[in-house]
């Protein structure tokens, strides 16, 4: 049901890939809401995203909506929508990103982001001067948005869903739990290691060029050892750890190492575009984002469950030649 049967209030609906054909099937049952950002130019980064309020029940959805309008969209509750809008805000304020991500790691109570304004109904294609239903003001939101942004990056490689937000909250809680454990020397070292890895991961999220590949490889190496002597080992150990096909992931990791050594951006672009297997499996941005996300989340789980860095690194080495490296 798109309408809560208890109070009749609508869910909000985030529409991705909003385009001209969609405008022709908007009806009185769907209300579009523009969201407000400080930098109008940045809106072009998200020009294919629109917020809608859906005012009919699931069994009333016409076929033309099911095949087009709803196919590339996600349902959000009011609370989830606020987090989503805050993620949009972070992606539209790149000048503040690095400063605020440091604040987030240093102070679990830091709340640096304002709630985005979501405006009332407006005719399709016409801007409105109506009053906002979410005020754009100096109030702030919880730092869970920061942890969400760690997972999504900017610009978004994938549409954010309510499930992503829920997972980010759990991820945030685990990270904070690890960072707050400082009773022993090992726990303190683990806390700092986690902080450094998250910052490197963050940098790889906001820059998906050659710099991103370098940052992503730094993350992998910090988890598995020093780069000088484990390059070949990583190619086997990472696929084994992730449970994927060793041959495919090893091939990708070899390519990533090769690309990182290339200083010429044009040559870097050519290497990726001229590799048909890589092009068909993942484009470079999506693969780097996916691989580092999976690795970071698994690593956080291991440490959260009490495993030390040394135990983490040695537990997945079941080949004698790698254990000697």
Go through the PLM ranges and name each one.
Residues 188, 203-210, 247-254, 279-283:
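Short, solvent-exposed segments of well-ordered alpha helices
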Residues 218-225, 237-240, 261-262, 304-325:
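Extended, amphipathic alpha-helical scaffolds
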């Amino acid at each position: 049901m798109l309408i809560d049967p208890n109070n009749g209030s609508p869910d909000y609906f985030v529409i991705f890939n909003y385009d001209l054909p969609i405008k022709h099937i908007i009806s009185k049952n769907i209300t579009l809401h523009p969201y407000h950002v400080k930098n109008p130019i940045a809106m072009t980064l998200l020009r294919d995203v629109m917020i809608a309020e859906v005012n009919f029940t699931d069994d009333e959805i016409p076929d033309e909506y099911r095949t087009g309008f709803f196919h590339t969209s996600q349902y959000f509750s009011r609370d989830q929508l606020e987090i989503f809008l805050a993620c949009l805000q972070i992606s539209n304020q790149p000048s503040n990103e690095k400063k605020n991500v440091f604040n987030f790691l240093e102070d679990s109570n830091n709340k640096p982001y304002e709630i985005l304004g979501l405006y009332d109904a407006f005719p399709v294609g016409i801007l409105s001067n109506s009053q906002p239903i979410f005020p754009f003001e100096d109030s702030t939101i919880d730092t869970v948005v920061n942890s969400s942004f760690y997972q999504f990056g900017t610009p978004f490689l994938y549409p954010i869903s309510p499930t992503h937000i829920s997972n980010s909250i759990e991820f945030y809680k685990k990270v904070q739990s690890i960072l707050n454990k400082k009773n022993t020397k090992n726990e303190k070292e683990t806390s700092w290691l986690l902080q450094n890895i998250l910052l490197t991961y963050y940098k790889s999220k906001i820059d998906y060029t050659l710099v991103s590949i370098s940052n992503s490889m730094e993350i992998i190496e910090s988890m598995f050892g020093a780069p000088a002597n484990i390059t070949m080992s990583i190619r086997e150990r990472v696929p084994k750890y992730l449970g994927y096909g060793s041959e495919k992931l090893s091939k990708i990791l070899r390519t990533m190492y090769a690309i990182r050594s290339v200083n010429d951006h044009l040559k870097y672009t050519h290497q990726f575009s001229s590799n048909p297997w890589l092009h068909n499996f993942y484009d470079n941005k999506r693969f780097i984002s996916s691989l580092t996300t999976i690795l970071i989340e698994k690593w956080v789980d291991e440490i959260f469950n009490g495993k030390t860095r040394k135990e983490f690194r040695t537990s997945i080495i079941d080949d004698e030649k790698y254990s000697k490296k």
